[in-house]
C-alpha cells in the first residue's frame, strides 16, 4: 500500500529538551563490575548520548560518601554527553517551621555540594517527592496544600542562595492525576515552579491497541496547553508500558513483580512500537523532555528484599547485562531526537502511521515513522523548509526481525535514500519503525594505535577525537584479518579488554564515533 506525508519546519518552534532515561543505577553503580559498566552501561549511554536524565538524589540526609559516588557516576555518564539532570528526592513528614526550614536547608546544602564542589553544573531540576509520595505512594495528591508547603520552603531557600535549580511540580502519576497541575496553577504555584511534570504507565491498553497514541497525545496536549499562558514547560519524568503487578501477576512465589509486562509475556519486540509511539506522541504534543523508566534494571532482590524491578533497556540479571529489544527502537529516538533541537510538524492522512521529527540548528533533521499496518507501506514524503545536500540514512527496527547485537551496539543504517528536490520515498515494513536522518557526518575515525596483547589482555592508546564514543575489539587468526561483526569480541569505553577466550589470536581495535562511523 502507499501513503503520503508532509514534514515541515516551522519558522517559530519551542525547543525540545531531549529523550533519555530514569537512571536508577546511579545510586548503586559501584556494585557493577568493570565488564558491566565499561562494556554495557557506560558504552551504551555514550553511544546514545541522551539529552535528559532523571535520577534519585538531593535527599536531605544524603551523606558525603553517597554524593561522591553519585557524582563520580555522573562524571562518567551524564557529564560526558551533556544531559540535563533532574533529581527527585524524598523525605519524611515535617510539622514545624523549624523542621521545614532545616529540611530545605539540608536539600540546598547537598545540591550546592554537587554543583559547586563536584562540578555537576547540569543538575538543573529538582522535585521534593516521587509521584507525590510522602507517607505512602501518591498520598500528596490528596494533600496538595502539604506538597505546596514543602515546595515553598525549598523555593525560598533556593532563591536566598541563588541556587540555579528549577523546582518541578507535581510529578504526579498516572496521567489521570495530571489534574494536580491544574490545582497548582489555581493555587499560586506557578511563581515558585519553573517547570511542571508527570508520569504515565500504559496499564489499560495492550501493545496491539491502535487508539492509545491518540489518547495519550491528547492528555499530553491538554497539560502542555494548560501551561502555555504561564510560559512553563511540561516534562514526562517517567513513562513505560503495562506493569505486570497490575495485569494479574502481582507476585510469583512471594516476589513482587514490579516489571514491564511485555518483557515477560512474549511481546518484548512488538511492544517497542508502542513505547516509541508514546514518545512521539509526547514530542508532537509539545512535551519538553522525557525519561523512560529505566536505563538499567534494578539488581535482583537479596536478603529481605522481595521486589523484582526489571524495566531496563539493559538487563541486570545476575551476570546477564545485555540489551533488550527496545534499545534498537527507542535507542534510535534517544540518539537522534537531540537536546535543543526543534520539533517538526508532520501531517499524514494515514491513522496507522505515527511519526515525529526534529531539526537541529545546523539544518540536519531526523524523522521517525512507526508503521502499525500489518503490511509494508510505500510513503512519499514532501519536505517543507528543509534542505539536504546529502542522502538520508535509513535505520530500521523490524519487530519481526530485531537487529540485535551481542554487544548492545545500535544497528547500522541499512540504506541511503536520495532526496529528489523536496521529495523522499521510503518503504516501511509491517509493524516496523524507520528513522531517516541527515544528522551525520561521513567520517573515518582515526586508527587506534598502541595495540598490545599480553596474557589475554589487550590494551591500546585512547582516541583523542572529540566525536569518539566507544571502541570495538576484534579477534582473528592472522595479523591481516579484516574486522567484521562475526569476529567482534567486545565493545567498550575502556582502553583495555581481557579476553575470556584463552585461545591465541590477533586483535584489532576500532573507534566508533557519534554518527556510528568506524
Model regions: which residues?
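C-terminal beta-strand-rich structural cap/linker in extracellular carbohydrate-active enzymes
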Residues: 411-443, 507
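Pro/Thr/Ser/Gly-rich low-complexity, intrinsically disordered linker/stalk tracts
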Residues: 440-467, 513-518
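Beta-strand-rich modules
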Residues: 499-517
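Substrate-binding cleft and catalytic face of glycoside hydrolase catalytic domains
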Residues: 45-207
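Solvent-exposed loop/turn segments flanking beta-strands in beta-repeat/beta-sandwich domains
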Residues: 463-485
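Noncatalytic carbohydrate-binding groove/subsite architecture in carbohydrate-active enzymes
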Residues: 143-275, 285
Amino acid at each position: 500500500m502507499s501513503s503520503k506525508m508532509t514534514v515541515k519546519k516551522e519558522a517559530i518552534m519551542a525547543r525540545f529538551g531531549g529523550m533519555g532515561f530514569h537512571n536508577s543505577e546511579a545510586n548503586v553503580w559501584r556494585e557493577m563490575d568493570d565488564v558491566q559498566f565499561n562494556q554495557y552501561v557506560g558504552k551504551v549511554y555514550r553511544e546514545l548520548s541522551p539529552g535528559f536524565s532523571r535520577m534519585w538524589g538531593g535527599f536531605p540526609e544524603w551523606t558525603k560518601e553517597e554524593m561522591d559516588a553519585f557524582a563520580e557516576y555522573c562524571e562518567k555518564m551524564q557529564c560526558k554527553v551533556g544531559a540535563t539532570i533532574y533529581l527527585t528526592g524524598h523525605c519524611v513528614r515535617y510539622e514545624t517551621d523549624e523542621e521545614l526550614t532545616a529540611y530545605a536547608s539540608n536539600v540546598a546544602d547537598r545540591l550546592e555540594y554537587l554543583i559547586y564542589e563536584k562540578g555537576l553544573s547540569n543538575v538543573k531540576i529538582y522535585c521534593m517527592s516521587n509521584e507525590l509520595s510522602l507517607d505512602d505512594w501518591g498520598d500528596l495528591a490528596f494533600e496538595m496544600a502539604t506538597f505546596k508547603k514543602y515546595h515553598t520552603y525549598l523555593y525560598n531557600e533556593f532563591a536566598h542562595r541563588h541556587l540555579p535549580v528549577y523546582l518541578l511540580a507535581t510529578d504526579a502519576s498516572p496521567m489521570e492525576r495530571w489534574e494536580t497541575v491544574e490545582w497548582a496553577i489555581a493555587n499560586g504555584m506557578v511563581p515558585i515552579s519553573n517547570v511542571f511534570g508527570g508520569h504515565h504507565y500504559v496499564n489499560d491498553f495492550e501493545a496491539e491497541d491502535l487508539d492509545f497514541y491518540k489518547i495519550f497525545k491528547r492528555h499530553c496536549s491538554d497539560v502542555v496547553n494548560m501551561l502555555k499562558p504561564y510560559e512553563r514547560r511540561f516534562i514526562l519524568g517517567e513513562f513505560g508500558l503495562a506493569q505486570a503487578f497490575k495485569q494479574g501477576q502481582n507476585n510469583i512465589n512471594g516476589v513482587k513483580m514490579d516489571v514491564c509486562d511485555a518483557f515477560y509475556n512474549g511481546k518484548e519486540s512488538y511492544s517497542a512500537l508502542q513505547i516509541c509511539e508514546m514518545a512521539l506522541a509526547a514530542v508532537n504534543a509539545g512535551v519538553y523532555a522525557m525519561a523512560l523508566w529505566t536505563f538499567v534494571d534494578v539488581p535482583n532482590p537479596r536478603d529481605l528484599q522481595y521486589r523484582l524491578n526489571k524495566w531496563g533497556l539493559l538487563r541486570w540479571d545476575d551476570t546477564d547485562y545485555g540489551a533488550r529489544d527496545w534499545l534498537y527502537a527507542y535507542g534510535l529516538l534517544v540518539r537522534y531526537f537531540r537536546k535543543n533541537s526543534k520539533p517538526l510538524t508532520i501531517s499524514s492522512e494515514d491513522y496507522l502511521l505515527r511519526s515525529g521529527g526534529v531539526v537541529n540548528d545546523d539544518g540536519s533533521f531526523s524523522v521517525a515513522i512507526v508503521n502499525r499496518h500489518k503490511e509494508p507501506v510505500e510513503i512519499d514524503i514532501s519536505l517543507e523548509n528543509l534542505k539536504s545536500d546529502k542522502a538520508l540514512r535509513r535505520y530500521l527496527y523490524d519487530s519481526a526481525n530485531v537487529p540485535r547485537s551481542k554487544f548492545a551496539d545500535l544497528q547500522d543504517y541499512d540504506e541511503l535514500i536520495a532526496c529528489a528536490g523536496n521529495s523522499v520515498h521510503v518503504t516501511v515494513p509491517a509493524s516496523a519503525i524507520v528513522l531517516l536522518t541527515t544528522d551525520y557526518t561521513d567520517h573515518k575515525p582515526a586508527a587506534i594505535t598502541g595495540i598490545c596483547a599480553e596474557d589475554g589482555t589487550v590494551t591500546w592508546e585512547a582516541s583523542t577525537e572529540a566525536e569518539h564514543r566507544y571502541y570495538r575489539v576484534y579477534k582473528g587468526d592472522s595479523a591481516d584479518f579484516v574486522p567484521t561483526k562475526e569476529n567482534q569480541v567486545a565493545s567498550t569505553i575502556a582502553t583495555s579488554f581481557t579476553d575470556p577466550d584463552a585461545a591465541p589470536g590477533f586483535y584489532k581495535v576500532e573507534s566508533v564515533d557519534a554518527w556510528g562511523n568506524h
